């Protein structure tokens, strides 16, 4: 099954690095995406805000120069934010590659 997503946008928030119980560093950034897409032959304005999850030293290192307001492109996979409550209904993008655009 396919689960791959590529988004560009502006970083609007950066949360502190935390560690999982297993000691893996993990950081959440918030990306705001705006674009025009075509759907059913009609141009449509698209706006979305999504949490980006960076896990591991390499991923967090790739975001070391990212600041609020930075334009970036990310690729990765979509997963639910958690297993209980409202988190089951929220999606996060788990980043596998990050490119600075500015």
Protein language model features and the residues they cover:
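Single-stranded nucleic acid-binding surfaces, predominantly the OB-fold ssDNA-binding core
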Residues: 1-102
């Amino acid at each position: 099954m396919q689960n791959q997503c590529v988004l560009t946008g502006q970083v609007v928030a950066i949360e502190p690095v935390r560690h999982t119980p297993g000691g893996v560093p993990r950081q959440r950034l918030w990306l705001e995406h705006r674009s025009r897409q075509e759907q059913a032959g009609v141009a449509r304005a698209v706006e979305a805000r999504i949490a980006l999850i960076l896990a591991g030293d390499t991923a967090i290192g790739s975001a070391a120069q990212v600041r609020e307001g930075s334009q970036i492109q990310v690729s990765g996979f979509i997963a639910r934010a958690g297993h209980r409550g409202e988190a089951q209904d929220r999606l996060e993008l788990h980043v596998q590659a990050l490119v600075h655009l500015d």
